[in-house]
Amino acid sequence: MYKRIMVAVDGSEIAQQALAEGINIANTYNATLCIVNCIGGENDTDKNKGNEILEKAKSDTDVLSVETRLLNAEAEYGLNGIADAIAAAVYDWKADLIVVGTSNRRGLERFYVGSVAEQLVAKVDSSILLVRSK
């Protein structure tokens, strides 16, 4: 069913839960997994942190021998930039499933802050699995 699964990670607990779901699905369908992290700028600190996040995520996949790709996507600052960078990565890599974590924001906080996951739904044609925090 799914052959190319992309998981967006940012080092948060909910991203770890999304990664676990992505690994499980990739293992079930013998799919290739692409782990993507958005970096916000040209500075080395952002790139180094992005690489650390990806390497940590990759170590989680090595245990199950899931074929994995790592990708740092450069994003403009702000939620739109992150969603745009992930959407571009989805199209470039031709992912057929995207797995992302989503917070449980409600009310005014959700209105003002928004959601990368929400924006992805509007930007991509691939299936999206939203993983809520437990």
What residue spans do the PLM features occupy?
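General small-molecule cofactor/ligand-binding pocket signal
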Residues: 36, 67-71, 129
